[in-house]
A protein has these predicted regions:
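Conserved strand-turn element in the central/C-terminal portion of the radical SAM core barrel
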Residues: 79-87
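N-terminal beta1-alpha1-beta2 module of alpha/beta enzyme domains
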Residues: 1-73, 77-80
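Glycine-rich anion/phosphate-binding loops
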Residues: 26-29, 86-90
């Protein structure tokens, strides 16, 4: 997607917070469906974060989520909102 100065860009930050105890497969499917819907609506970008200090979290690595979304979206740009380097082996 190229820069278009004639219109405003729209995007979201997908906060990596999910309630403890919910089905992780369904929660991840909801996140993916949301981003697919935003892609169809014409949103320009989505930023996916990670969070390790909340105890339990579904998205431990935004890169894996982005890889899955790259196959399911068409034009929306995908990026990591946060990558906590100490939690990832080089």
């Amino acid at each position: 997607m190229t820069y278009r100065p004639d219109r405003m860009s729209f995007g979201i930050f997908l906060a990596p917070f999910h309630k403890t105890g919910q089905n992780p497969t369904l929660a991840l499917d909801r996140d993916m469906a949301l981003i697919e819907h935003l892609d169809r609506l014409g949103f320009d970008e989505v930023w996916i974060g990670e969070h390790h200090s909340a105890g339990w979290e579904l998205i431990a690595d935004p890169g894996l989520v982005i890889a899955a979304l790259a196959n399911r979206t068409r034009t929306i740009r995908l990026g990591t909102g946060v990558t906590s380097l100490p939690y990832h082996h080089p």
